[in-house]
Amino acid sequence: MINDLFCDISDKLIGTGYFDTVYEYCEIIKRTDGTLRPMYYKSLKAGYVDVQNFDKNGTAYIRKRGNVSVQIDRTATRLTSCTDTVQMITATFPLRLVVAVPKSQLEDSPLVDDIVAAELIGVLQSDMQSTATAMDAVSVVCAVSGYDTDSVTIWEAENKGVLLDETKVYRFAYVAIDFNCEIKGDVTCLQNCLKNEY
């Protein structure tokens, strides 16, 4: 299931010790006051919860940053008999990881945001074969395309109509990492991955 992908990434991120909480799959939501914020869907009863609690001992969230693409991999079509073919697909999820880690818990360095980013990039690009196996996929690969450590730029990309509270944000290493997760498998795998999940 696609849930396995996000739970696995979340577990690996929590393993760094930077975060108390990782929200696995967030969306930018328009609130009743007209502002836009990243929020996590908890349940029908609880609704959406705010993920930008800078009072926490480190927090992180993952959100989609565009449309998921699904392509048929014609070169990977396999014939097992004259009448039986397996159609392979590649689903690419464009994602963004946003983290806030208290600087008081980090090395005292002007490069602290970049140091955090480098470690998290290593986590995101680590081996995902166990996740692929759990999803019944051929492979799962996460590849980072870039990162940002400018607090103002990150805040403005994640929020609309919400003022940046400099007294809070600048006490944290505030990092955004863009990455793609590519899942390869047969069509049945994709159907199973997305069924009744995110």
Regions from the PLM with identified roles:
Residues 76-78, 95-103, 179-187:
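Beta-strand elements of well-folded, non-transmembrane domains
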Residues 62-73, 95, 171-181:
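A short hydrophobic beta-strand element
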Residues 1-15, 84-88, 136-198:
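Short, charged interaction patches at domain edges and termini
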